[in-house]
UniProtKB/Swiss-Prot annotation:
GO terms for molecular function: heme binding; metal ion binding; tryptophan 2,3-dioxygenase activity. This is Tryptophan 2,3-dioxygenase. Keywords: Dioxygenase, Heme, Iron, Metal-binding, Oxidoreductase, Tryptophan catabolism. Pathway: Amino-acid degradation; L-tryptophan degradation via kynurenine pathway; L-kynurenine from L-tryptophan: step 1/2. The keyword Transit peptide does not apply. The keyword Iron applies. Coiled coil: none annotated. Belongs to the tryptophan 2,3-dioxygenase family. Substrate binds at F75, I76, I77, Q78, H79, Y137, R141, T278.
Amino acid sequence: MQTPGLPEEKPAQGCPFGHGAVASSVATPAADSGDGWHDAQLDFSESMSYGDYLSLGTVLDAQHPLSPDHNEMLFIIQHQTSELWMKLALYELRAALQAVHRDELPPAFKMLARVSRIMEQLVQAWSVLATMTPSEYTAMRPYLGSSSGFQSYQYRQIEFLLGNKNEQMLKPHAHRADVLAEVKASLEAPSFYDEVVRLLARRGFAISAARLERDWTQPTVHDASVEAAWLEVYRNPSQHWELYEMAEELVDLEDAFRQWRFRHVTTVERIIGFKQGTGGTSGATYLRKMLDVVLFPELWHVRTML
């Protein structure tokens, strides 16, 4: 009941993060009440916990060092977490490709931006691995056998999805029929950029038939008709805003990918110099050659033409 002459009292409101508990108007010390702690659920015997949801038992039990060296745990976790980020990158890129195929560009922009941020995360991860010295790596290297990041089938699918196709890169996966089928499907399917070039054609640009009907298993090469289309987009961005935004999202993505490649080669040089890689490649020399790969050639060359 309201007391005459006094302002009306408002009913106490429950904290939106308090699981329905009514907020007290008097501050109380943060202490264990005996029945719980800050209203948090503490009994998960009949409900799903954080660890259950994330399958942490499986994830955190997936590190099996083969050497007695302390630093091998870093090496394993560096690569396992990178594979998890690559899984998400593939998930987003494939969804973005399908969105472009349906002419739904705004969702594709969000997904591409997310992939670029994933690449930035992967770039920063090299700084952690770079804390391993040559002496530390030498102690554990014999235990790696011929295993190498060169054999990462998720990374290979990202390369293929971004247009850097090479049929020879199927061979490292021939011993796993399931993986081989997955990587081969990525090789034979149109790349993300191929789908964007199709989009240009659907938007009325005169893309050559040879470009639209090319062999999807081959790497992306410069095409004059595609560059002419992008030149028109960049000269009149307000008239082709979605295509303009798509172009810039792709440049952001390749820029981040180039940074990842650069940090990869410098980290390898820092740790093993110019020794042969465990997978049989020339190591840093091979990685330096990969720095010259251009994924979206017309988008870079058009800047010179403007």
